[in-house]
């Protein structure tokens, strides 16, 4: 296996969903940063009226001052949508984890958290993305009204406890949180395909039928394979691995390298 670079630089962002009327204001964010020795607010546009400093989109705009720049691990991140200004544009959500229903704009308001413009070109680099997710976990631990995190590359909404536990375990050396940072969908022909894996490795995963006849078992296999592929950085040529039951599985990238197919030999 060789490392393949992901092309999805613009997707390196997430959304923090708060109960209606519970978004934090700039004072709450500054107090939050003051409690963590590794976190700082490095720019507040309320103290600088230069319109050019305002981030575009996501509810940000000249004169609104509804954002702050945060510094963590030597990297800057923009937090957009703080109260009392307008919330960030509510994200597209297609998958849910540890949530009873898909969240929507009727019940929640969003803040966007993303790499600052000076480092956004780093895209899906692992150090940058890990710091972004670690910062989101900090928010979950500090704000009780934060109900869920939406990971944009997978269009997945993740309940606060599941997000924090799975992400923290990965950051501490555990398995990649495939349920949440990726998702799985069943195709019309009965295969199981990943959603959002291309952010991490530039490729999606397809588990071919009949290997995915048992959806639960296929999802477990998908979780294992996603962890394997993220660790490896992608797949550039045919490979074989052993399944949990000892049978051999074949992995093959498509001609354009965009899809990795898996089947039992």
Predicted regions and their residues:
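Short, extreme N-terminal segment that most often corresponds to the first beta-strand
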Residues: 1-47, 256-265
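Short, compositionally biased low-complexity segments
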Residues: 4-5, 101-112, 191-201
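Conserved aromatic-histidine-acidic binding/catalytic patches
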Residues: 17, 120-128, 210-217
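N-terminal low-complexity, intrinsically disordered segments
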Residues: 22-103
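Short, well-ordered alpha-helical segments
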Residues: 26, 30, 126, 130-133, ...
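Structural alpha-beta junctions
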Residues: 35-43, 133-148, 230-237
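Internal, hydrophobic cores of structured domains that mediate oligomerization or house catalytic pockets
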Residues: 75-176
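Aromatic/basic-lined ligand-recognition segments
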Residues: 92, 151-265
